[in-house]
Amino acid sequence: MTEQQPDKEKRLGITWHDLTVKGIGKDAAFHENVASQFNIPSRVKESRAKPLLKTIVDNSHGCVKPGEMLLVLGRPGAGCTSLLKVLANRRLGYTKVTGEVWYGSMTADEAKQYRGQIVMNTEEELFFPTLTVQQTIDFATRMKVPHHLPTNLTNPEEFQKTNRDFLLRAMGIEHTGDTRVGNEFVRGVSGGERKRVSIIETMATRGSVFCWDNSTRGLDASTALEYVRCMRSMTDVLGLSSIVTLYQAGNGIYDLFDKVLVLDEGKQTFYGPMHQAKPFMEEMGFLYTDGANIADYLTSVTVPTERQVRPDMENRFPRNANELRSHYEKTQLKRTMALEYNYPNSPQAAEATKEFKEAVHLEKHPGLPAGSPLTVSFYTQVKSAIIRQYQLLWSDKATFLIPQCLNFVQALISGSLFYNAPHDSSGLAFKSGSLFFAVLLNALLSMSEVTGSFAARPVLAKHRGFALYHPAAYCFAQIAADIPLIAMQVTLFALPVYWMTGLKPTGEAFLTYWIITISVTMCMTALFRAIGAAFSSFDAAIKVTGFLMSALIMYTGFLIPKSRMHPWLGWIFWINPLAYGYEAVLSNEFHGQLIPCVNNNLVPNGPGYNNSEFQACAGIRGAPMGASVITGDQYLQGLSYSHAHVWRNFAIVWVWWALFVILTVYFTSNWSQVSGNSGYLVVPREKANKTMHTAVDEEVGSGPDSHDSRNRSGISPIGDKQETSTDGPSKIDSQLIRNTSVFTWKGLTYTVKTPSGDRVLLDHVQGWVKPGMLGALMGSSGAGKTTLLDVLAQRKTEGIIKGSILVDGRDLPVSFQRSAGYCEQLDVHEPLATVREALEFSALLRQSRDTSVENKLKYVDTIIDLLEMHDIENTLIGTTAAGLSVEQRKRLTIGVELVSKPSILIFLDEPTSGLDGQAAFNIVRFLRKLADVGQAVLVTIHQPSASLFAQFDTLLLLAKGGKTVYFGNVGVNGATVNEYFGRNGAPCPQNTNPAEHMIDVVSGSKDWNEVWLASPEYTAMTQELDHLIRDAASKPPATLDDGHEFATPIWTQLKLVTHRNNTSLWRNTNYINNKLMLHITSGLLNGFSFWKIGNTVADLQMHLFTIFNFIFVAPGVIAQLQPLFLERRDIYEAREKKSKMYHWSAFATGLIVSELPYLVVCAVVYYMTWYYTVGFPSGSDKAGAVFFVVLMYEFIYTGIGQAIAAYTPNAIFAVLINPLIIAILVFFCGVYVPYAQIQAVWRYWLYYLDPFNYLMGSLLIFTTFDAPVHCEKEEFAVFNTPDGQTCGEYLAEYMQGLGSRTNLVNPSATRDCKVCQFRTGGDYLYTLNLKDYYYGWRDAGIVALFAISSYAKLRTKASKKAES
């Protein structure tokens, strides 16, 4: 550390005085549903109500000089996080901040340019989960290499590696370098190790003032202590100012701080030296229990159910925050501490600030602007961001490679579809379609940028707070990564398609095509990236994306020729990059070509009509009157295109690209981690009458922090002494289910494969849990605690498991996974369900099918009583920012498992992680209560206080590598464990928490696994285990297996899951509104773009393309519905599938059925905005038939979208797959290539399997079949007859044969014969293989069949079972 000091020291210090922080006062808010959002009077009334301002931090003051550490303590909701955010100069989101904050001698405004030196580590762990630990830390340390290096280091790379290795070693996670960071859905390092990665990333900023918000969450006691010791050392050596808020801080941690500041309801009740805090509280009459955590004691004094008061002070002690503050304000200590507030005006502060500025200047690259808070050069920022961009791509190989492979397959299919397109008029549609698709598909693939933008945003906002790099560096890195990737993507597509289609066979033409396609793809990627950056919510961004994509496709020039665009929307063409690209590739292809007219485009043709002098082109744009051959340039001119525009358009596309990049940089630069008040309950509008106390309670907790608030639900603090009375079993206790089974595991080994070989995560672990036993599973971070729980609960799907896991001495029953409750570390719930709904859902699905519904619901009431959740039972689960708090969510997680009446045992993984001491004690108190009435409970726990640890009966202690170091009784206040370790050379010092002591001991160099295996306790434990297994096996099983994998029949599952999804969608107004808005806007766009189509030959194409455009409502809506589907699937796979709640078919059916009512509404709004606008037949028979098909299509594309999502690992992957699937369906529907011209390899099977074929067929028949056709002047084939014959005589044979569907308008003329290609729409449809009117109803029926069958099986995995 000393080697890393710069010549000038960065000793800054921070002082604040009269600091008050206010935010919008909101403890509960109503959540609208689909119907209530239209209650305009109510909404207007609420919007006019002036929002109440709530004081979050009230008149705080303090000073942390260089080299000092301040511990900020307070219950959740006290304002600790808000205080730290404001001290870290992060004020965005707060309504009002008053008072002074000084950094050295700088004001808060002056300090803004030193953003990277005043940093905050938040409680959230925001990372790219697929990157490894080393890649994550490499990036952070690269961005903070000083320009002037220490004398002992020669280059930036050496400094970066030295810094990285030091930080990894200091946090004890150097062994995880090649492991993914992971998150709740991506497997990676353990929770404690991930928290240490977060700490290292913050330390890598090499700042001067550090604010740490609950940064020991998820760390075991030993690692937490080591981390604070490390922070203490760095603070001392480097002269840092460290401000820390912690929950469940042990006394060893507490003693490392210089000062302590206690907040309660935002009021500062104590600020002073650490050693004076406890005597100060004792002096006011609050009793301290020997061995208790002093930090918890300091925050408990305002909690009536937790504090203990000296008898002689019962009538005089301060009862609330105001009285406590008032008492503190009168003390000499307050006056002494106030002397520090002049520090900013002192010579020391001025000198320190001057040195700080010089040191930062020396660190900063000279090429950066003077006011920039960054450290390394812009080139280094971009270079490092490019490396990370490729690491991100390569770390998720499936999402990167599979779409590329599918893209190539798509190219082969496309090439085969357009294979060897003729170089005459019959090939014009082929080539135009192929060129349009080349431009379109690559643009559609770019839509994934919107999803990717929102996935990356939280990490980028965090890095901006750390001043690691300029947002422009990230944007340019993406561009640099785009170029080779897009070049590869386009090349994989262009090579097969171009040469298989038989486009112009010259190198120059191919290179032009390739360059134009790359340019358009780059431009569209930049466009969608800009859209993603511009919006704060994904729903809004995807709504705009869907509409914009429809508009751009429609106005490319392929669906609507340039000359037929209506003026009110034709301007879209001129701002459309796709239009410029399409004109360029089309002009590149047809320039200089000679195109003979053939088949239907040559009138007359066939036997006896071979003289071109008496033939003419028909239906070909740009064809001169009477000509039988057309040049490519004439064809282009007919489309209002010109070859001279190719390179002009190329330049215009790149100008658009530059504009989109500038917009992306601008919007990305404005991303930030919003501070401000959050954390309030959300009440569904339909439950308003049941929860009025929640919404209007004036006394609801005052802490709108990012943490939970002890009172924000309007409930009294849990832990009422009456509840914990042991005077006899309560009514609740008597209603709780009791376990009778013995659960054992013996010789359990779990091995996984890693790049470096097999890795043993559990090594011959054994133990048991009996009814009435509360067992603790402990160990350092990464010791295998969660892994053991996963293996015991049968949740592992990979790796090799050996050993035995038995219930009552027998193999696990079929019903084990639903008979054992498992509360995972992460609280995964349906966010739009209420607490009661979540509990009832679990009870109804997981309790035995022999239990009546009434009794199941009564048991839910029992659990709500037990967990004291009455006041929040009708509030939405939501998120921690808007919904249940961390502790309330944890209670709900436990409740969801309890209501299932687990008949074997309950597993809990880190139930107290992230909670304050009081909340943690309440959770363990509940578990103790459960064990006391006969439940078997096994809990992993990280940082138990002495009083918490004393609640457990037994302990299984693991060391690194999943090795057992102790299994047995805890003893009274840990006496048995202490005796064991004392006897083996590690006695527990007096007044030391035994839990912290033993984890500290087993984390050392001594092999405690060997000590355990040689101990008499191990021998006795093995004998007891064998006895338990034999004894249980000799008796009838205590828990009878009903033989059912699921507790309820499939019909019940279907009803309950569908009901939950219906309720969820009813409340999901964003999703429903966006879906409806997309249909309304798309319908209007389609309708007004094809306004009142006429009856010319060209209008027949317009009929076709307006219907074809209707298909393109699907991509936008699918992109919107898939993330919702994947969120639900993640909930299902993370918890509900593992606990055997219900079958996948119930999951899929529930999602499908819940969508149906909204799909009907969507069909109605699209139909009403489109059908009559384009001028389709108004007769009820045809209009009704079209509506039926439109409705069926809504069902089809929803099924397709959900099926794609069901088989893809994530939302970005799904967005990449969508265009490929939709493109294949579009290809073979008979529009791009008519049936007769589809290659035989596809024609006889894929054409008939394509639902879009029948969709297009039915809609075309009903709208176009009976329409008369009237050719415009330029649409007639005009030619002369030989030897003075009349037109009728000359064409007699032709009109009987190939021209039977054409219309000769002047049969008696002898020259200038005028032939119209078609007489009715039916003649045109005949060329599309739609030969009769009944085809319409045939195809409509087949569309309905596809709608029913378009839903696919949800992917699922089997769990691993132990090998004996």
Swiss-Prot record:
Keyword rRNA processing on entry: no
Ligand binding (ATP): G779, S780, S781, G782, A783, G784, K785, T786
Free-text biotechnology note from the record: Cordycepin has antitumor, antibacterial, antifungal, antivirus, and immune regulation properties; thus, cordycepin has important value in commerce, medicine, and scientific research.
Region (Disordered) residue spans: 697-732
Topological relation to the membrane, as annotated: Multi-pass membrane protein
Subcellular localization(s) per the UniProt record: Cell membrane
Keywords of the record: ATP-binding, Cell membrane, Glycoprotein, Membrane, Nucleotide-binding, Transmembrane, Transmembrane helix, Transport
Induction profile: Expression remains unchanged during the development of fruiting bodies.
Entry-linked SUPFAM superfamilies: P-loop containing nucleoside triphosphate hydrolases
Gene3D superfamilies noted in UniProt: P-loop containing nucleotide triphosphate hydrolases
GO MF, one example: ABC-type transporter activity
Transmembrane domains' residue ranges: 435-455, 483-503, 508-528, 540-560, 567-587, 650-670, 1076-1094, 1105-1125, 1146-1166, 1185-1205, 1211-1231, 1245-1265
Residue ranges constituting the ABC transporter domain according to the UniProt record: 42-290, 737-985
A Pfam family of this chain: ABC_tran
Entry-linked InterPro entries: AAA+_ATPase, ABC2_TM, ABC_transporter-like_ATP-bd, ABC_transporter-like_CS, ABCG_dom, ABCG_PDR_1, ABCG_PDR_2, P-loop_NTPase
Note: Cordycepin and pentostatin biosynthesis coupling is an important point of metabolic regulation where pentostatin safeguards cordycepin from deamination by inhibiting adenosine deaminase (ADA) activity. ADA is not inhibited until cordycepin reaches self-toxic levels, at which point ADA derepression occurs allowing for detoxification of cordycepin to 3'-deoxyinosine.
PANTHER family: ATP-BINDING CASSETTE TRANSPORTER
Function: ABC-type transporter; part of the gene cluster that mediates the biosynthesis of cordycepin (COR) and pentostatin (PTN), two adenosine analogs with related bioactivity profiles as both mimic adenosine and can inhibit some of the processes that are adenosine dependent. Mediates the pumping of pentostatin but not of cordycepin out of fungal cells. Decreasing intracellular pentostatin releases adenosine deaminase (ADA) inhibition, allowing ADA to deaminate cordycepin into non-toxic 3'-d.
Family: Belongs to the ABC transporter superfamily. ABCG family. PDR (TC 3.A.1.205) subfamily.
The protein, known as: ABC-type transporter cns4
Gene: cns4
